[in-house]
A protein has these predicted regions:
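N-terminal hydrophobic targeting signals that begin at the initiator methionine
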Residues: 1-3
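Bacterial N-terminal signal peptides
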Residues: 5-19
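Sec/Tat signal peptide C-region and signal peptidase I cleavage site
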Residues: 20-24
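N-terminal pre-domain segments of enzymes
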Residues: 25-70
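Buried hydrophobic positions in well-ordered alpha/beta secondary-structure cores of metabolic enzymes
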Residues: 49, 164, 225-227
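Structural motif
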Residues: 50, 232-234
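Feature captures the catalytic cores and cofactor-binding loops of soluble hydro-lyases/lyases
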Residues: 60-68, 72-223, 236-301
């Protein structure tokens, strides 16, 4: 008897393929599945089911560092949401955006033939690395798993980078490489996190999923997550935790600001500021928050 053992990853793909209709779309995850696999998100969604964290929350997350996001995620049990070790092109203000995922695998002719046939049925134009750009909307960050390939693993050059920025007004993350860096550097505010750069063109790969769960190094990434880039690396925040990350970080910053002000004014000692605050201190702090127009408050202890 011949026994065949399937890996968990292969089993997952087979389940999706067998559950899909006869003319399955390339993305493999349906709208209902994107909703099913993000059950804790109760807010708005894109037409394809991807969670849509509000722009107002995205703006607040631009002040968040990897360390600050890490604390909230760890407390919530999310221990695989950070990945470091990137080369950054056009570093500037922090990269923040709603994740659109894409996954590539080494090319296998029989599978790639089916993928291209399905692409034609879906009226997709150009090479497979351009298909993923067509679905981007303002505020999106394209996150591509290209299995760390550098030589012949260049997902974009300056032309497709221009197209990405025109659609999303945001950046790119690729566990692979890019080319035409001189041209990419001429695209203002287009921030790229990449594993490397190479002059070769993209070859011998195939696009096997759009807006499906992917792995970026040690991080598990879902469509609709919020990508936050800073000098330490990339943090992928589940949508249901995005506002809490923003709230907790804002509170930390405001506590520091008020504490420094109290020390400069001589109203409290360093020991008082660094220890458990009294009820009177909390009341004064909350009154100061109200005066600043902040909506968050410190609860009484």
């Amino acid at each position: 008897m011949i026994r065949i053992t399937l890996t968990a990853g292969l089993m997952g793909w087979l389940v999706l393929l067998l559950a899909a209709p006869a003319h399955a779309q390339l993305d493999l995850f349906s709208k209902s599945q994107r909703i099913e696999f993000t059950p804790e998100w109760q807010g708005d969604r894109f037409p394809d089911g991807r969670p849509k964290v509000p722009d107002s929350v995205l703006a607040r997350l631009k002040d968040v560092s990897a360390d600050e996001a890490w604390d909230v995620l760890q407390d919530a049990g999310y221990r695989s949401q950070f990945e470091g070790g990137w080369k950054v092109i056009n570093p500037g203000e922090r990269l923040v955006g709603r994740v659109v995922t894409a996954v590539f695998m080494p090319k296998r002719p029989d599978l790639d033939s089916v993928i291209r046939q399905n692409g034609k049925k879906e009226n997709r134009i150009g090479d497979e690395n351009s298909w993923i750009i067509d679905i981007l909307t303002p505020g999106d960050v394209l996150v591509v798993d290209l299995f760390g390939k550098i030589r012949y693993g260049t997902i974009v050059g300056d032309n497709l980078s221009t197209a990405i920025y025109a659609k999303s007004h945001n950046g790119l993350i690729v566990n692979g490489a890019v080319r035409d860096v001189t041209g990419i550097q001429k695209i203002p505010s287009f921030e790229v996190y990449t594993r490397g750069v190479d002059p070769s063109a993209l070859e011998n790969v195939m696009l096997t999923g759009i807006n499906v769960p992917i792995r970026i190094g040690d991080a598990t990434v879902m469509p609709g997550d919020i990508a936050i880039g800073d000098p330490e690396g990339l943090t992928f925040v589940p949508p249901q935790l995005a506002e809490k990350v923003a709230d907790d970080t804002e509170m930390d910053h405001l506590v520091d600001e008020w504490g420094h002000m109290m020390l400069r004014q001589g109203k409290y000692t360093p020991g008082q500021i660094d220890s458990r605050w009294t009820k009177e201190m909390i009341e004064q702090f909350n009154a100061w928050l109200e005066g600043k127009g902040s909506k968050i408050r410190m609860p009484e202890r």
